[in-house]
Amino acid sequence: MKFVLLFGVLLVTLFSYSSAEMLDDFDQADEDELLSLIEKEEARKDCIPKHHECTSNKHGCCRGHLFKYKCQCTTVVTQSREETERCFCGTPPHHKAAELVVGFGKKIFG
């Protein structure tokens, strides 16, 4: 049972990694988006780093090692009993698992 679970996690990780790489390749290969690529390069300089607030710009998080960080939001109750939404750039759990498996694979296979 452990082997099946480990194999399943590895399969999902490899699929996530390959699909993310394919999407990046398609974005870069499209000649019509040359100007948008230049704009993206400028936007990368202004991207929001990990663990910083992204409440006002939910799609402006930087890229991590393998995946782009996602804006994760939570509801916070202030002392005056008002609910506000706070968001930060972070790595989702399934991306953390994928990075862990890829890291182990790189250590094992070179």
From Swiss-Prot:
One GO location term (cellular component): extracellular region
Tissue: Expressed by the venom gland.
Lineage top rank: taxon: Eukaryota
Residue stretches spanning the membrane: none
Signal peptide region: 1-20
UniProt-listed InterPro entries: Spider_toxin_CSTX_knottin, Spider_toxin_CSTX_Knottin_CS
Residues that make up the propeptide removed upon maturation: 21-44
Keywords: Disulfide bond, Knottin, Secreted, Signal, Toxin
Main localization, broad class: secreted
Disulphides: 47-62, 54-71, 61-89, 73-87
Listed GO MF terms: toxin activity
Subcellular location(s) of the protein: Secreted
Domains: entry comment: The presence of a 'disulfide through disulfide knot' structurally defines this protein as a knottin.
Similarity annotation: Belongs to the neurotoxin 19 (CSTX) family. 03 subfamily.
Name of this chain's protein: U1-lycotoxin-Ls1dd
Organism in which the protein naturally occurs: Lycosa singoriensis
